[in-house]
């Protein structure tokens, strides 16, 4: 086997296959600089298909969730079509990623990507679509509940001193109401100021006295903050109360939550 290879050959192989630099170099070294044999090498290793698919948009897939020993994990695994998302190999990959994360308490998605890269590449070659380990989250707590709405929406919520029935209802509420923050006080100043500037511009068209405009803007901002904060949202199971009211009645509080929706913010 050759120990070095001409960069011109690497460039040509990349141009013909779309495979990455290192994959092309390795294939050429293993095939002693023979382009055609290197192409076959890439195909056999699965690198050719995987590299060509890497930029394909993945906005289908599934949300996976699992709880074990006071640890909850949630994963969004993407593919290109709904058909592949139902493939057993795709489902097994998602489930195995969660098992690995739970057993080793892995919090870093990049670590999971490294561990499962060869498995991902192999699956890309088999199904002919790009597969993307898009996002992952781990939470810890004494009382964790997981809720999946089909495979498209997933919620993990951690609470203290809250029975499973109420915790399930709150998880379902989170799935439906899409809160972004736990409490109004958690809303970032950046998010608040961006919305404030929008409301300020909208108010200029109302032709109202400045003191009245201030009240209008303040009212809209309060509504905005409440709408994106879990504890201030009207509880979907009992809309005359807020989620905060339900928690207070049960002498409990939510420690953390995470909500994934399939394909969120993925370019179409």
From Swiss-Prot:
<comment type="similarity">
    <text>Belongs to the EF-Ts family.</text>
</comment>
<keyword id="KW-0648">Protein biosynthesis</keyword>
<dbReference type="Pfam" id="PF00889">
    <property type="entry name" value="EF_TS"/>
</dbReference>
<dbReference type="GO" id="GO:0005737">
    <property type="term" value="C:cytoplasm"/>
</dbReference>
<dbReference type="InterPro" id="IPR009060">
    <property type="entry name" value="UBA-like_sf"/>
</dbReference>
<protein>
    <recommendedName>
        <fullName>Elongation factor Ts</fullName>
    </recommendedName>
</protein>
<feature type="region of interest" description="Involved in Mg(2+) ion dislocation from EF-Tu">
    <location>
        <begin position="81"/>
        <end position="84"/>
    </location>
</feature>
<dbReference type="InterPro" id="IPR036402">
    <property type="entry name" value="EF-Ts_dimer_sf"/>
</dbReference>
<dbReference type="InterPro" id="IPR018101">
    <property type="entry name" value="Transl_elong_Ts_CS"/>
</dbReference>
<dbReference type="InterPro" id="IPR014039">
    <property type="entry name" value="Transl_elong_EFTs/EF1B_dimer"/>
</dbReference>
<comment type="function">
    <text>Associates with the EF-Tu.GDP complex and induces the exchange of GDP to GTP. It remains bound to the aminoacyl-tRNA.EF-Tu.GTP complex up to the GTP hydrolysis stage on the ribosome.</text>
</comment>
<keyword id="KW-0963">Cytoplasm</keyword>
<dbReference type="InterPro" id="IPR001816">
    <property type="entry name" value="Transl_elong_EFTs/EF1B"/>
</dbReference>
<keyword id="KW-0251">Elongation factor</keyword>
<dbReference type="GO" id="GO:0003746">
    <property type="term" value="F:translation elongation factor activity"/>
</dbReference>
């Amino acid at each position: 086997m050759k120990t070095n290879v001409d960069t011109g050959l690497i460039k040509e192989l990349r141009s013909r296959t779309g495979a990455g630099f290192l994959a092309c170099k390795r294939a050429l070294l293993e095939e002693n600089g023979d382009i055609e044999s290197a192409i076959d090498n890439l195909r056999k290793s699965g690198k050719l298909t995987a590299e060509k698919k890497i930029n394909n948009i993945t906005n289908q897939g599934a949300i996976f969730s699992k709880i074990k020993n006071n640890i909850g994990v949630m994963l969004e695994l993407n593919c290109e079509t709904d058909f592949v998302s139902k493939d057993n190999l795709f489902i097994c990959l998602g489930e195995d990623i969660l098992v690995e994360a739970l057993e080793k308490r892995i919090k870093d998605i990049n670590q999971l990507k490294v561990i499962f890269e060869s498995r991902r590449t192999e699956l890309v070659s088999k199904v002919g679509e790009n597969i993307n380990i898009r996002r992952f989250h781990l939470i810890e707590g004494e009382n964790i509940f997981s809720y999946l709405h089909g495979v498209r929406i997933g919620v993990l919520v951690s609470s203290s001193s809250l029975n499973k029935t109420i915790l399930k209802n709150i998880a379902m509420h989170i799935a439906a109401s899409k809160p972004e923050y736990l409490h109004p006080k958690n809303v970032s100043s950046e998010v608040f100021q961006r919305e404030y500037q929008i409301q300020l511009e909208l108010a200029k068209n109302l032709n109202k006295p400045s003191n009245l405009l201030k009240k209008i803007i303040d009212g809209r901002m309060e509504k905005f903050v409440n709408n994106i904060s879990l504890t201030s949202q009207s509880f979907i199971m009992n809309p005359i109360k807020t989620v905060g009211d339900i928690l207070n009645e049960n002498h409990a509080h939510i420690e953390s939550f995470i909500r994934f929706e399939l394909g969120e913010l993925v370019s179409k």
